[in-house]
Regions:
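Conserved N-terminal Rossmann-fold NAD(P) cofactor-binding segment
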Residues: 1-26, 34-35
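Structural signal for hydrophobic packing residues in well-ordered secondary-structure cores
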Residues: 3-8, 29, 36, 66, ...
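Structural signal for conserved beta-strand scaffold positions within catalytic alpha/beta enzyme cores
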Residues: 18, 98, 125-127
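Short, internal active-site loops enriched in acidic
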Residues: 20-22, 76-80, 130-133
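Redox-cofactor binding/interface segments in oxidoreductases and associated redox assembly factors
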Residues: 28-30, 73
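Gly-rich Lys/Arg/Thr-decorated short loops/hinges at beta-loop-alpha junctions or inter-strand turns
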Residues: 34-43
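Rossmann-like NAD(P)(H) cofactor-binding subdomain of soluble oxidoreductases
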Residues: 43-109
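C-terminal substrate-binding/catalytic lobe of Rossmann-fold NAD(P)-dependent dehydrogenases
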Residues: 89-94, 104-179
Length: 179
C-alpha cells in the first residue's frame, strides 16, 4: 500500500451513511463521482464536467445538514472540485480540504523507500504543486534515514542510480490506476 508511511490509528471508526448523518459528523470524506473508464484519456480533467455537477449536488445535500464537519475532498479533478465546494457553497475555509498531493507524497515516499530498501517511515520527502500532472518533487527537501538525498546515493550502494524523472512520472501515473 502506498500509505504505509502514515501512522495507523486503531480508534477510528469509518462507515458509510446517508446525508442525514452529516448533521452529527465530525469528518466527511467526499469520494463522489465516476472514475475514468478503461480506454479513456488518463487525464483527471476528463472527469471535470461530470464531477462538477456531482460535487454541486453532493454539497447541496451536505450543507443542508452541516457546515461544522471537516470536509475532505478526494474526488478528481481534486483541486478544482475543492475550490467549487468551498466558494460556491461558502463552506468554512478552515474546514474544507482537498487531499492535494498528500497521497502523491505517500506514494513517492513508499516508492523511494522500496528502491533504497528502507522502511517508508524513514523517508521524508514531499510532492508539491497541484495534484496530478503538474506536481513536482523538491529534491533538496528529501532525506532517507535522516541523510539528505544528495548524499544518500554516494553513502549507500544502490543497484542502480535513482532516476528522478522516472520516479516522478511513476508517482503521477500510479494514482490514475485508482481513478
Amino acid at each position: 500500500s502506498h500509505t504505509t508511511a502514515f501512522a495507523y490509528s486503531s480508534n477510528t471508526n469509518i462507515r458509510v451513511g446517508g446525508f442525514e448523518e452529516c448533521e452529527d459528523a465530525q469528518i466527511i470524506i467526499n469520494t463522489a463521482g465516476p472514475s475514468i473508464q478503461p480506454g479513456n484519456s488518463r487525464d483527471r480533467m476528463v472527469l471535470l464536467q461530470t464531477n462538477v455537477e456531482v460535487m454541486r449536488e453532493t454539497m447541496k445535500k451536505i450543507v443542508s445538514y452541516t457546515r461544522d464537519a471537516i470536509l475532505i475532498n478526494v474526488s478528481n479533478p481534486m483541486d478544482i472540485l475543492t475550490y467549487i465546494a468551498q466558494h460556491e457553497f461558502r463552506y468554512p475555509m478552515n474546514k474544507i480540504f482537498g487531499t492535494g498531493t498528500l497521497l502523491d507524497t505517500a506514494r513517492f515516499n513508499k516508492m523511494l523507500a522500496d528502491i533504497c530498501k528502507v522502511d517508508a517511515k524513514n523517508v521524508t520527502g514531499f510532492v508539491m504543486g497541484e495534484h496530478g500532472g503538474t506536481c513536482f518533487i523538491p529534491w533538496n527537501c528529501v532525506n532517507i534515514v535522516g541523510i539528505p538525498f544528495s548524499e544518500f546515493q554516494s553513502q549507500f550502494e544502490l543497484e542502480e542510480p535513482i532516476d528522478k524523472e522516472k520516479l516522478l512520472h511513476e508517482v503521477k501515473v500510479s494514482g490514475l490506476d485508482i481513478v
